[in-house]
Structures are given as structure tokens and as C-alpha cells.
A protein has these predicted regions:
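Rossmann-fold NAD(P) dinucleotide-binding segment
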Residues: 55-64, 72-91
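C-terminal substrate-binding/catalytic lobe of Rossmann-fold NAD(P)-dependent oxidoreductases
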Residues: 3, 14-15, 22-28, 32-55, ...
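Short alpha-helices
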Residues: 110-135, 285
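General beta-strand structural signal in soluble alpha/beta enzymes
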Residues: 90-91, 116-120, 146, 169-170
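Glycine-rich Rossmann-fold phosphate-binding loop(s) that bind the pyrophosphate
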Residues: 9
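Rossmann-fold NAD(P)-binding glycine/threonine-rich loop
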Residues: 92-116
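Oxidoreductase and adenylate-handling cofactor-binding alpha/beta cores
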Residues: 126-142, 157-167, 291
Length: 300
């Protein structure tokens, strides 16, 4: 039995809690929040909700702390700070900034002699492993990744941090013609813009500057600036009615060549279709938390 702490209790934190309940060898020690703990209700009976200020009291009671924050601003600060004191895992998904995040977390974990695993979800995460396997088998070829159609938690969180935004959902949508060309083994050369579009549904605060919000979204580096992005302003009622679910998915495809003249084409594909992005991501995090615990026990 290994003991898990959840740091942050939004959609992902709830997904981790649900995953812990389905794994017989895991125990939830506590949920830690920056909010007033009295306002946070969890599903696991007999488990406490604590303010993050109380976390240090649990240093010897938690085997792995699963950090459930946003990649835009939370995880770059949280994960290094917490890795000094706990074995930690996060799902940081800003691909362009992973090397920087790795260096910061690695330095912090070494200070506390802890193990830290970053960017562990399905992309980055399971999709990263799929690319590795496919490249090993087909060294001559081309990789393609398509996401969606589905809600990106990280991109939605990034929008919600813009001044004047009350709530937001961001859908990543693959360009159908591009997916078809890849699956047909045509090996197209595709720009970022040619592979996906982004659809944003935003609930603005009263009297917010809508033009400012739209511009901030469309020009946001690492998130939207390289894509054709549509921004739709809707009411809170429409958000609750039409965008409450959090589905997602996607495919990693490698089109490779074999033969002395590279005359044969092979298409390998690993795909996911998810009813709940946070619940699946939470399940991945719990699985890898188990590995962290085993590595730590072995002195790795």
C-alpha cells in the first residue's frame, strides 16, 4: 500500500481521487488546497482536506505527492518548491518549456534527495512513449500527432488567467484532410496551423473588454499564436449546458519506410478516445506514482 497526497483540487485533482479509489494498493492521505478547506468537498470518506500551509506536517506520511495545477503559471512554481520536500509528479504540458521545467525540478529534487517525474500524462506522457517505440521500429519515417476533438485543460486554464475571463473551454480540433493524408501514407509536410484549429468558448466578466480578451488569446505564445483560433463569447448558462463535459483524445502516427529501396510504407498508430480527460490523466498519474514509490524504495 502506498500513500498519495493530492495538491490542488480542480478537475485533475478530482480525477486523481477517482483513480486512487480504483487502485487497491493506493491510499489517499489528504487533499491540499489553497482555498478554504471548509469549502472543498471530496468523495473519499475519512480523508481530510487541508490548506497547503499544513502540508509540511505530512512529510513522513505521503509517499508521492501528485501536483494538480495548471501548466501556465502553477506548475513552474509549485513543482520545484514541493520537490525539495516530497517525491512528486506533475502533468506539465507546455512542450516548448519542458527542458526548462525539467532543469528547475531536477535541481530542487536533488536538494531534498527526492524523486520527481514531470510532464506525465498522455501527451506528453503515453504519446511520448508511443513515438519512442515507433521510431525504434521504423527509424526511417515521419511522426505526426493529432489531438482532439476535445477539451484541453491546459489551454482552458491559460485562457481563464486572462484579465476579464470568468470561465473558458478550449477545444483542439484536428484538420480532417490532414489526418486522412497521413493515414493514407502520403507523408505530407504539415505546418502547425495545417494540423489543428482551436475553438475557444469564453464567459467574460461583466463589462470586460472582449476585444482585449480575444487578442490576448489569439496572440498567446506556445498556446494559440501558431493556430487558426476562433473565439466565441457565451453566457455562464450556455457554458454549463453545452460544455460541462471534458472529453479529449488523439493519435500518434508514424509513417515509415522499409526495404532496400524504401519501397514499402508502414503506418503505425496509437490512439485514445477519452470521455474524461482529467480522469484519464489522473489514472496515468497514479500509475506512475506507483513507479516513483518503487524507485524510491530501491534507492534509485
Amino acid at each position: 500500500m502506498f500513500k498519495i497526497g493530492i495538491y490542488g483540487y480542480g478537475n485533475l485533482g478530482r480525477g486523481v481521487e477517482a483513480a486512487v479509489a480504483l487502485n487497491d494498493d493506493t491510499e489517499l492521505v489528504g487533499v491540499f488546497t489553497r482555498r478554504d478547506p471548509a469549502t472543498v468537498k471530496i468523495r473519499t470518506s475519512g480523508v481530510g482536506v487541508y490548506h497547503t500551509d499544513e502540508l509540511e506536517k505530512f512529510k513522513d506520511k505521503i509517499d508521492v505527492l501528485i501536483i494538480c495545477g495548471g501548466s501556465a503559471t502553477d506548475l513552474p512554481e509549485m513543482t520545484p518548491a514541493l520537490a525539495k520536500h516530497f517525491n512528486v509528479i506533475d502533468s506539465f504540458d507546455t512542450h516548448a518549456k519542458i527542458p526548462e521545467h525539467f532543469e528547475n525540478v531536477d535541481d530542487a529534487a536533488k536538494i531534498g534527495d527526492n524523486i520527481a517525474l514531470i510532464s506525465c500524462g498522455w501527451d506528453p506522457g503515453l504519446f511520448s512513449l508511443a513515438r519512442l517505440y515507433m521510431n525504434a521500429v521504423l527509424p526511417v519515417g515521419q511522426d505526426y500527432t493529432f489531438w482532439g476533438r476535445g477539451v484541453s485543460q491546459g489551454h482552458s486554464d491559460a485562457i481563464r488567467r486572462i484579465k476579464g475571463v470568468k470561465d473558458a473551454r478550449q477545444y483542439t480540433v484536428p484538420v480532417a484532410s490532414a489526418v486522412e493524408a497521413v493515414r493514407n501514407g502520403e507523408d505530407p509536410v504539415l505546418s502547425t496551423r495545417e494540423k489543428h484549429t482551436r475553438e475557444c468558448y469564453v464567459v467574460a466578466e461583466e463589462c470586460a473588454d472582449l476585444a482585449y480578451i480575444e487578442n490576448e488569446i489569439k496572440t498567446m505564445p506556445n498556446y494559440f499564436s501558431d493556430y487558426d483560433t476562433a473565439v466565441h463569447f457565451i453566457s455562464s448558462e450556455e457554458m454549463a449546458r453545452d460544455h460541462a463535459a471534458l472529453p479529449h483524445g488523439g493519435s500518434v502516427i508514424r509513417s515509415g519506410k522499409t526495404g532496400f529501396d524504401k519501397e514499402n510504407t508502414h503506418v503505425c498508430e496509437f490512439s485514445l478516445k477519452l470521455d474524461s480527460n482529467p480522469e484519464f490523466t489522473g489514472s496515468v498519474l497514479v500509475a506512475y506514482a506507483r513507479a516513483i514509490k518503487k524507485m524510491y524504495d530501491r534507492g534509485c
